[in-house]
Design a protein with these regions (language model features):
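Loop-to-transmembrane boundary segments
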Residues: 1-9
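Transmembrane helix-loop-helix hairpins at the membrane interface
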Residues: 89-217
């Protein structure tokens, strides 16, 4: 059912949110203010955190402590913090040439790639330092809680990562989804080696660094 989100991508030949008319309609307003960005962050966390807790049985079969333990949402150690920082930086360095390679293969095959300018315009309202922090926290914590915290312990590495990838089908073409899938595999492997907190840290730092690099360019 998750892959139903890919139906518009298949029908249109490109990610729905990158279609020119939709993209222009979404970018008619001024850049988001700090207050608006913080409100978006609060809204996202206000539903994802309770949803994750409910999904693992809180408060019916687990108390808060055991629910957080089931989600592997714990306070990371200093070593884990250092590991998270190192992995996030490594992913930023490695994913750039990998994304380029995927684009070259897609172009060679004659398949549509995710246009970089359109993707940048999609996130234009939040392309500032505060927006980078908000996107990092929102995506990092929300997506990792649901995919690596709730689903992976029950369903293993692959199925939750397919769900994670499908969540991005409205904003990327299939070349971008392959990149997301590879990133998700990295987060999933990290979850087996550490915990969801470290996954959220790495995911959030990765998104933050990518946005900041885009701003500086």
């Amino acid at each position: 059912l998750t892959w139903l989100s890919c139906v518009p991508l298949l029908a249109l030949g490109q990610a729905p949110l990158l279609v020119s008319g939709i993209l222009e309609a979404m970018n008619t307003g001024a850049p988001a203010t700090t207050r608006e960005q913080l409100s978006e962050l609060a809204t996202a966390l206000a539903w994802t955190i309770p949803t994750a807790l409910l999904a693992v049985g809180y408060p019916l079969v687990r108390n808060l402590g055991t629910a957080l333990a089931r989600l592997a949402l714990v306070v990371p150690t200093r070593r884990q913090l250092a590991l998270g920082l190192a992995v996030a930086v490594a992913l930023v360095v490695l994913m750039d040439p990998l994304t380029l390679l995927i684009s070259l293969v897609w172009n060679w095959l004659g398949w549509p790639v995710s246009p970089a300018e359109s993707v940048e315009r999609l996130f234009a309202r939040n392309l500032n330092p505060v927006g980078a922090v908000v996107m990092g926290i929102t995506a990092g914590l929300s997506e990792e809680l649901l995919c690596r915290g709730v689903l992976q312990p029950r369903l293993g590495l692959l199925l939750p990562n397919l769900f994670f990838t499908a969540l991005h089908a409205y904003q990327y073409n299939f070349d971008g989804l392959l990149t997301v899938f590879i990133l998700g595999l990295a987060f999933g492997v990290l979850r087996t080696r550490a915990n969801t907190s470290v996954c959220a840290l790495v995911h959030g730092l990765y998104d933050f660094l990518v946005v900041m690099i885009t701003i500086l360019e």
